[in-house]
Structures are given as structure tokens and as C-alpha cells.
Amino acid sequence: MWFSPTPSLFGENTVRHGGGGWVASLERTLGETPGIELGIAFELADSRFKAVENGVTYYPIDANIRRTQKIKRKLGLVSECDALLARAERVIDDFKPDLIHVFGSESCFGLLSERSDVPLMIHMQGSLPAYANARFPPGYSRFDFLRACGGNPLSLYRMISNDRAFLRRARGEENALRTCRHFMGRTEWDRAIAAIYSPTASYDYCAEALRPDFFDESRVWTPPGGERISLVSTLSNPLYKGADLILKTARLLRHEIGRELDWQVFGIDKARLQEAKTGVQAGDCGVAFKGVAEGTTIRDALLAADVYVHPSYIDNSPNSLCEAQVLGLPVVATNVGGVASLVRDGQDGFLVPANDPFMMAQRITQLKDDPERARGMGRSARELARDRHAPDRIRADLAAIYLKHAKDTA
């Protein structure tokens, strides 16, 4: 029984995001594995209790309760998880699973281990306590958000309530981590998080499933040539995703090193606060925020680029980076969280310190100016990533993990 942050392949509700779709990719990978009957529960406003599609039982959980209750949840007067967990218990009673697989320790569903006797495994994604520690880049604070609201009371309310909700969810995740007895992950960083909060719990390795758009054997990166440096990044909105580092690095590349630059940033369509704080306008140094895009659009942009750049201040195992590796693209990434478990520094790409635009700019320039080295790094990254994310391997690993822990039911 999966408890997912997205509807996965249910109906037409597959999440569209610059680097998303990983739950749907795993569902495709698992396919019709013998001996596995799959149920998937997720938050979605839908009148049906359950629906069966292609042999999978989907449970859309509609937790959008009365407006007064929603306001209380926003203000922190009632738990945002209570209504969701009550509905989740009903799903468990109906499906009667041998094992519960929760995607993400930050989910309310991780607290089901306190409400059910069914073995529960948390599939580590990010980790909000760690993200809370790094959520403001150097030089940023809550006051920057206050100023960005421009005196708009509604914007101010949303900012404050969202920040409080983030911190509440981080505390809730700590409770889920402490009570969980089984974890699954893929980096030394998420293994460490699990061990800190639940030192006696089991931990199993399973790589992340990637979108099939990136596994086309005929699509292999080669250095594009030319003088202009072409870069691609995929981000989301939080400040800790590093849009400010992109702007600072782009300024150095364009105005200090003197290189022509084309840096496509997918997943966000603006970074006004970061532009104001850094004093760097994206358009003045070749940065274009492209917004959310389809996987094929990002894939084609990667194949035409010189380097994939990942600038986060904290991360676990960004699928966007792995997708670039599968295509054979060299990467430059900040050495944070679980990234060092994905990139062998100097072999598949380069790792640089967080918030170091100088080293990032230099590594990008090195790869551009040495296409044979870039080609070798890309080839190494492709071999590593295609083995790591091979669907058959993931399917076998996941089935073995399920069999191992479902036996605990007795």
C-alpha cells in the first residue's frame, strides 16, 4: 500500500513539474510484478472512495474539509494531519495491506506507524528538519519576505502562515522519523537522517526511478562546440534551491570571465527577490527562467547544453541531476546533502562548496574549454546512472524489500 504525495498514474492527474513524476515513474517500473498487488492513496479532491485502473487500486483522499476547519489548520489551532490520518486508516482497513510504503518522511502519512499494526516503511525523499536548517541562504532572512510583500496584508498573511506550516511539518516529520522502524533510501545522507532519529531501524537501499523520456538509447550527449556556454538547471521555488547562486555565478561568467552565456533554468519563472538581493538581473547575464516544462523539453535542452548545474543549498538525490547523468551530460553540483552519493568528484562531474560562485564558475569554464574531458566525464556519469536507475534492477530491489518486510506481519 503506497501513501503518495502525488496521484501517480491515476486518471489524468499525473503531476507536471520540471523534475517531477518520480512516483509515477516508479509505478511504471513496478508494473505487473508477480506477487505484488498495489494500492495507492493520495490527497485529491475526488468524490470516489476508490477506483481500480489497470490492476491498481487508487484511493483519492479528499481532506479538504469545511472552511472554518481549514482556517484553524492554517493558524495551527488544530493538527493538519488528524483528518488526513483518519481517512488513511479507513483506506488501510479496506485494502488490508501486508506492508505500507510512505513516500517522504515529511508526509503526515509517516505518522500511521502509531495507528496501525501493519509494517510501515518510509521512503526517504528530502528531510524538512535539515531543510529548515538551510532554508535561508547567507544574507537572507524572514525580513526579506516581509519587504517582498510590499505592505500587502494578504501576501503578508500567506507568507507568515506558510512559514509556520513549514516549521510545523518539520516537527511532525521528526515524530514520524522517531517512530518508524523501516526506512528505504539511496544516499549516505538520508541513511544518516534515519539513523539519527531511529538508530535501531532497518535501512534498505533502492535507487529512484526516472522518467522514461531520458532512457532513449539513441539520445546521447556530445559537446555542442561553439564559444557560447550553454547551461541547464532545474529548480523549484524555495530559496534553498539556489537561484541566487545561479545569478552570482552567471555574473562572474559573463562580466568577469567575459563569456557569452545561455543558462536555461526550468521549474521557476522568476526570481525577483534573488535579483534584488544579489543586484544581478537575470536577463543581463544570459539567465532565462523557463518555468515548468515537459520532460521531453528538458531532455532536449540538456542534450544541447555544455553542463548541467545543480546549485542547491540542501538536497538529497535530485532526479534532475540523475536525468542529466543518464543522458551522458557532465554536471557541476554543490556538495550538499546526498549529492556526493550521486557524483564522483572529478570523475562524473565536479562538486563545489555551497554558495561558492567562484568555484562553480571556474569548473563550468574548465568543462567548456576541455571538451574531451567533458566527454569522458559524461560517459562515466552515463554508465554509472544507467546502472543505478535501471528499471529491472529497481523492480527486483523493490520486490525483495517488500518481501523481506511483509514477513514482519506475523
Functional labels for PLM-detected ranges:
Residues 222-241, 247-251, 264:
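Conserved donor-binding/catalytic core segment of Leloir-type glycosyltransferases
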Residues 345-346, 350-357, 366-371:
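Conserved acidic donor-binding segment of nucleotide-sugar-dependent glycosyltransferases
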Residues 313:
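Aromatic "clamp/platform" in nucleotide-sugar-dependent glycosyltransferases that forms part
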Residues 359, 366, 373-387, 394-400:
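A short, well-ordered alpha-helix in the C-terminal region of glycosyltransferases
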Residues 1-47, 251:
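N-terminal subdomain of nucleotide-sugar transferases
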Residues 274-299:
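Nucleotide-activated donor-binding/catalytic signature segment of Leloir-type glycosyltransferases, i.e.
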Residues 330-333:
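Short hydrophobic beta-strand element within catalytic cores of glycosyltransferases
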Residues 234, 247, 259-275, 291:
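Glycosyltransferase donor-sugar binding loop
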